From Swiss-Prot:
Protein name per the record: Trypsin 3A1
Lineage: Eukaryota, Metazoa, Ecdysozoa, Arthropoda, Hexapoda
Disulfide topology: C53-C69, C178-C194, C205-C229
Expressing tissues: Midgut.
Marked site (Required for specificity) residue numbers: D203
SMART domains, per the entry: Tryp_SPc (SM00020)
Amino acid sequence: MNQFLFVSFCALLGLSQVSAATLSSGRIVGGFQIDIAEVPHQVSLQRSGRHFCGGSIISPRWVLTAAHCTTNTDPAAYTIRAGSTDRTNGGIIVKVKSVIPHPQYNGDTYNYDFSLLELDESIGFSRSIEAIALPEASETVADGAMCTVSGWGDTKNVFEMNTLLRAVNVPSYNQAECAAALVNVVPVTEQMICAGYAAGGKDSCQGDSGGPLVSGDKLVGVVSWGKGCALPNLPGVYARVSTVRQWIREVSEV
């Protein structure tokens, strides 16, 4: 990626971001094609029928994505596609009833890059549609723990969307080292978690923003931002879900 925002799912993909000043949005780089049944919590967030961000099902009525994906808070602007490996067809399309960005979200620094989407109707769960568990506030991700990120974003750092879902496995990155690597971009805060390889080569990229970063069986991050895609010594940055667990519970009762 050049520079991007993303939400991630620690084990499958990498990082993704949305264009803004020096940041860009992303797609999976160095990953592999994956079936939706392997990541049934993954959804495509769409505008006018076109994919632009990812998201994660956390209950039959709620999806968690990145706040930078929902700067327009009019729910009529969005739908989600769930249950399909193909972002252009299959699965189900569900309207969004309300868009609730985190009240402390900062669009300049991407701090608290979370947004809850209340769906217009409850969705039924199946092999290809399922909620993912959330970490509690006290839970942490150890340095080097493998995570999976998934999405339909750019695979070649050229902002060209994938039609079929992809994922990448990346290790969590030491927080202090991540902050030092990105010190000239934006501050890496406690509300963020980093993942990637020092050598680069695997990451999320344009179009993956808002998607899941999964460690074990829990959603530990949301693809938020990064400096380029899959570049050496520049890990991807995700919004750390455990830090807003109470807010998610208060808003969604999940």
